[in-house]
């Protein structure tokens, strides 16, 4: 399939596909006329990239997953390198959640405390 069809089927723009190609994530085969040629495996690779980006992975972090698929594995998480990237991302998410819980606890504590007397703010009248 050509780049436009791949983009339509994958739900991404041709510009995005060219960007993936530029990064080496989606190497294109060329027809004799110079047109890029893709197959269903490339569609699977694009779906994997999109899924990972939606989970918060950078495009560079998707590389081990793409390489895993290219090696013939049924999923992008079937290889040790991609699983290691996944473990690191999980640790990042856990750290982020810890920070969010701290912020939440602080906000809840502030809301639960009585307002300070010098904090008398009167709302502005709106017209």
Predicted regions: what they are:
Residues 26-33, 37:
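Beta-hairpin "wing" of winged helix-turn-helix
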Residues 6, 13-16:
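Short glycine/proline-centered loop/turn elements that form peptide/ligand docking sites
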Residues 2-8, 40-127:
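Arg/Lys-rich, alpha-helical DNA-contact motif
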Residues 17-18, 49:
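Short, hydrophobic-biased segments on the C-terminal half of alpha helices
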